[in-house]
């Protein structure tokens, strides 16, 4: 009896353990599935709460074929039915690495799988620096948006990209405006014919980390294109990603990513408020009869010094685009530095004649 009883108890225990193991597996699968649904819910909430995009609109996705941009495309396709979006994909090939010519073929198959139209652009000249590549990509996106009437441009920037950009800006000595890193929503101003238009750029993945997207992409077995340049330690951003951030997590704070993301969000709010104030002040400029523009310099006597460069930068971007649209970012920046360093002047700076005294700043185009 004892032996049989012991055998029955042992058998029941083994059955109970087996059932408990099955329950644990089911619970794990359920939690994993819910976490995948959580990503989609966070993504849709970001579109709603941040006011990024409206329903029934045309949305162009800047896609590199990598994890972030393909996951962005997949999430948008999942919500496409409810939001009635019209989606399109554009791929910009910088010709920076060997094998990049194979990426468009893979991306074309991905777009065919999702039922999304796709376009490809190849750089006609050799791009040496990352900033040159970014400027070229923006020009391509502007041209595609204006030609095919895309109302929004969406990029795959994540919370991890935001943190890396914040650290990069801090390490190179940026102002509070630069510390706000990447924003949820920006606008891209471009010239189309004789009119200037503004195209919204949205980043709906800014609340999701790269690790969460990797798990999501692996769960759905999304077809991704591998970019070996992301492992190149000669690129500063990669050193921040693979060396600095792991060091900070290990030796400083395991939650450093969350804290830096909060810092980026707070500085973004503060900088947006400062920009609003400076924009209102900047509206005091006047156009003068000889085709020039003047700005009341005397207002700087009653304004904090920290706002001077912001106000001047907004003013220069507004005024010089009409005086000389080809002046460019670097030309505007050079004039900004020149104005901040001199008290009074009457001189020519490139194609712009500058006259500055205690009360007024005047600028005219030299013909």
Swiss-Prot record:
InterPro entries xref list: Rossmann-like_a/b/a_fold (IPR014729), TilS/TtcA_N (IPR011063), tRNA_Ile_lys_synt (IPR012094), tRNA_Ile_lys_synt_N (IPR012795)
Main EC class the enzyme belongs to: ligase
Entry keyword set: ATP-binding, Chloroplast, Ligase, Nucleotide-binding, Plastid, tRNA processing
EC number: 6.3.4.19
Recorded catalytic activity of this chain's protein: cytidine(34) in tRNA(Ile2) + L-lysine + ATP = lysidine(34) in tRNA(Ile2) + AMP + diphosphate + H(+)
GO biological process terms held by the UniProt record: tRNA modification
Gene3D superfamilies xref list: HUPs (3.40.50.620)
Record keyword ATP-binding present: yes
One GO MF term: ATP binding
Principal location: plastid
UniProt: ATP binding residues: 64-69
Compartment list: Plastid, Chloroplast
PANTHER family associated with the record: TRNA(ILE)-LYSIDINE SYNTHASE-RELATED
Family from the record: Belongs to the tRNA(Ile)-lysidine synthase family.
Comment text on domains: The N-terminal region contains the highly conserved SGGXDS motif, predicted to be a P-loop motif involved in ATP binding.
Function: Ligates lysine onto the cytidine present at position 34 of the AUA codon-specific tRNA(Ile) that contains the anticodon CAU, in an ATP-dependent manner. Cytidine is converted to lysidine, thus changing the amino acid specificity of the tRNA from methionine to isoleucine.
Protein name according to UniProt: tRNA(Ile)-lysidine synthase, chloroplastic
Native source organism of the sequence: Nephroselmis olivacea
Lineage: Eukaryota, Viridiplantae, Chlorophyta, Nephroselmidophyceae, Nephroselmidales
Gene that this sequence comes from: tilS
């Amino acid at each position: 009896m004892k032996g049989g009883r012991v055998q029955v108890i042992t058998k029941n225990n083994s059955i109970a353990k087996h059932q408990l193991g099955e329950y644990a597996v089911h619970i794990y699968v359920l939690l994993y599935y819910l976490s995948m649904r959580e990503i989609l819910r966070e993504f849709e909430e970001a579109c709603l709460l941040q006011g990024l995009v409206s329903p029934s609109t045309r949305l162009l996705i800047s896609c590199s074929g990598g994890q972030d941009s393909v996951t962005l495309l997949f999430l948008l396709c999942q919500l496409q039915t409810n939001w009635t979006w019209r989606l399109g994909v554009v791929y910009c090939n910088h010709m920076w690495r060997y094998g990049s010519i194979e990426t468009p073929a893979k991306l074309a198959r991905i777009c065919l799988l999702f039922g999304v139209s796709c376009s490809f652009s190849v750089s006609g000249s050799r791009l040496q620096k990352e900033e040159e590549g970014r400027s070229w990509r923006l020009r391509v996106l502007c041209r595609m948006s204006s030609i095919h009437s895309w109302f929004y441009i969406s990029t795959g920037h994540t919370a991890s990209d935001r943190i890396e950009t914040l650290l990069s800006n801090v390490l190179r000595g940026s102002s509070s405006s630069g510390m706000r890193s990447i924003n949820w929503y920006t606008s891209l101003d471009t010239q189309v014919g004789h009119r200037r238009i503004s195209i919204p750029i949205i980043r709906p993945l800014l609340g999701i980390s790269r690790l969460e997207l990797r798990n999501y992409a692996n769960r759905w077995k999304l077809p991704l294109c591998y970019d070996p340049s992301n492992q190149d330690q000669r690129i500063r951003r990669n050193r921040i990603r693979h060396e600095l951030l792991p060091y900070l997590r290990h030796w400083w704070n395991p939650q450093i990513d969350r804290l830096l993301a909060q810092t980026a969000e707070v500085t973004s709010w503060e900088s947006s408020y400062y920009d609003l104030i400076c924009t209102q002040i900047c509206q005091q400029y006047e156009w003068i009869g000889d085709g020039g523009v003047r700005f009341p310099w005397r207002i700087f006597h009653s304004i904090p010094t920290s706002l001077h460069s912001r106000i001047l930068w907004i003013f220069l971007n507004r005024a010089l685009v009409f005086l000389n649209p080809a002046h460019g970012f670097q030309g505007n920046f050079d004039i900004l530095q020149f104005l901040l360093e001199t008290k009074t002047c009457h001189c020519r700076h490139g194609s712009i004649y500058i006259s500055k005294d205690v009360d007024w700043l005047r600028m005219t185009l030299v013909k």
